[in-house]
Design a protein with these regions (language model features):
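Metal-cofactor-dependent catalytic cores
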Residues: 1-157
Length: 157
C-alpha cells in the first residue's frame, strides 16, 4: 500500500510546482488547475519520496522542485510495468510513461546548476487520470491518503 506525501501544482509549465493541501483529479484531464492537465498522456506525474530524500542529501529541495504532482512512498515505481494503475480515492491513474527527460532549461537545473535529476533512477512516472465507474465525476486527493498500486491490472474490465 502506497501513500501520497504531497500534492504539488503549478499554473504554468516549466516552473517549480508548490505543495497544496488538496487537489481535484478530473477524469481524462488530471489535476484541475495544474498546467499539465489536459487531453494527453502526461496529465499527472509521480515521484517517489525516497528519490527526493536521496537528492536532499546533496542539496535541499522542496516537494514540487522536480515538477512532480504527487510525492509518493511505499512502492518501488521502478519495478512497475507500463501500464500500471493506481487507485487514489475514487480516481484511477494509469501509468503511461516511465521517465521524462530533463530538458536544458529545466527549473531544477536552473536552481541547482546540476543535471543530477536525469536518468531512469530519478525518473518521474507520468500518468493519465481515469474514473473506474463515473468518468465525468471528479475525485479529491489529499496528502496522507492511501494509494494502492495495482500493477498491470486494468480497472475497466
Amino acid at each position: 500500500m502506497g501513500k501520497i506525501l504531497a500534492i504539488c501544482t503549478s499554473p504554468r509549465r516549466g516552473t517549480l510546482k508548490t505543495p497544496v493541501p488538496s487537489a481535484v483529479l478530473a477524469p481524462e484531464w488530471g489535476i484541475v488547475g495544474d498546467a499539465h492537465g489536459g487531453s494527453w498522456h502526461r496529465q499527472v506525474s509521480l515521484l517517489s519520496a525516497e528519490k527526493i530524500e536521496a537528492f536532499r542529501q546533496k542539496l535541499w529541495v522542496d516537494y514540487g522542485a522536480f515538477g512532480e504532482n504527487l510525492v509518493v512512498e511505499g512502492f518501488d515505481l521502478a519495478t512497475l510495468p507500463v501500464p500500471s494503475f493506481f487507485a487514489i480515492g475514487d480516481a484511477v491513474l494509469e501509468m503511461t510513461q516511465i521517465g521524462k527527460e530533463c530538458h536544458s532549461d529545466c527549473a531544477i537545473r536552473r536552481q541547482t546548476a546540476t543535471a543530477s535529476c536525469r536518468g531512469r533512477a530519478f525518473s518521474r512516472w507520468c500518468c493519465a487520470a481515469h474514473h473506474p465507474h463515473r468518468r465525468r465525476d471528479e475525485a479529491a486527493a489529499h496528502p496522507g491518503r492511501s494509494a494502492p498500486a495495482r500493477g498491470g491490472d486494468h480497472p475497466f474490465r
